């Protein structure tokens, strides 16, 4: 027990949101700061009851049943999970009480109804005492629920009253309480944090008085020193209060009415107590919250003035390193009587902060920020600026003080997810917030060009699309100037698929790629009257037990493949192809290599160079490919031909739709978009055409499972 002269506040600062209060409760539980064990005496009130003082006490341990401070307060108003009171002028408190009493006598029923909706008090959650009936005790005779109440004050629930706090810790009715946080969110907060000692570093009774914030500019301030639970006020740039973000800003917020107070600086500080009573000029605001912890009621009472908060004189607990190391216990986060779950409130506050930060700059309206205008708006100094809530899918970057409790306990992400963080959203935010913000993004337009394929596959793509560990090597020149596609090896053996053909070195590519310098023919034309499809075929691969004669002549398979390509623009692929013989086929063979990953706005993507191609009427030429007899018996040889095949009735697939491009690998189900063409697998065994569609994003990616490797009868020698 502290001596009467040694009573000190638990904390000196500002309690912005519920997470701030929970951090302070947790700090008291772990003895990082202290509970107060008594009320301030009359001679101590002038010293203790001032802006910035925060008192936390255990009702049972301290024996405090009523918190008195000698100040006349207005009726309570609800702000989130808090109750707020505003200091009245003492000379007007009696007349205000009489005036409000008279108005209530005329419309008592309406007043009680409105009060019940905003502050539901007809059920005491803690003690389960019904206080809504006329015979039930009133709230005005005592501070906390569970005690006796008088019927007189129950009829006057919004009366200013005397110095006593009216219904300060009234419990919230069950039907107004939102569901607790989800298990996935709350699991990030363990019940204890073993690395923190449970020993107080300060003597009991000494208040935690935070030092003044550093004088660094806002642009150099470490973002981890900020808090997602409430806005760290910028001490270097005091700003005037905004009337309402939602009314003066062009941003259209989509939030529930229970969180609307976060969008208005005035409401966030004083609630609806604006002009209904005779408030004292530059008077105090009292903000309170009560929780049932370990079966006992704990209360937090804080005092502040709006001017001190807006001018940055008061900082929140979560903006200091001591509290950033604390892990909020699960029982506090999932306290069932919260009107708004703490993390929901914190996320909304941070969203406002981020949008306010972005809106202060002139941003292009499309495509990076379709919801923002180019106007510059005043920044709300109440909310945090430029933070990333660690509960979002993008993780791996140290964010705010709230993330110190969340991200520290998250499971490690795969390298793919970490890369996506930078390649996707961060690319958007960096472009949106760079110094050259006036320059709009370049809009993609139709053009005659070839896809710019990467020469090497990023490591994170190997991790995701190559679970077996085999490397996806691009087509590389070897000693005899042949081009080797090691991607073919994944189907059969680790041997390289090498063979010579006709006009020069050649290696069979994926079915969706057109090979350069193919001999054309007027035979074996394919019906051009139906959908644009690609015919994938495969042949018998020689095995080690059927070694061929190295002197045996090569056998050939003749398949029809399109000679000319359409000039239709494929918006997904971002390139335009015309007349394959003159453009694509005449180019260096490197243009025919496999397509690999191109980073695209956070989604894994899938497509092929062939998806933008269609065959005009009658266009075709033969595709000859030699079997690798004698060269490489174990090599996998896949052949393909493309063209307009007859329409084949097949059962609809779940992801089928008209105008699609090649399927995604069966091992990777990825969200995709499409436009343009269909792709059809052809089974050489049963002759069925399996038309499979998939949605893809704009850039190509490796597709290792495009071809079937069903064996053909060796006697047949060709496709049936």
Curated annotation (Swiss-Prot):
Native organism: Schizosaccharomyces pombe (strain 972 / ATCC 24843) (Fission yeast)
Biased composition (Low complexity): 146-163, 217-232
UniProt entry keywords in alphabetical sequence: Transport
GO molecular function: DNA binding
GO biological process: positive regulation of gluconate transmembrane transport; signal transduction
Function: Promotes the onset of gluconate uptake upon glucose starvation.
Family per record: To S.pombe pac2 in the N-terminal region.
Protein name: Gluconate transport inducer 1
Recorded GO CC terms: cytosol; nucleus
Region (Disordered): 146-165, 203-248
A Pfam family assignment: Gti1_Pac2
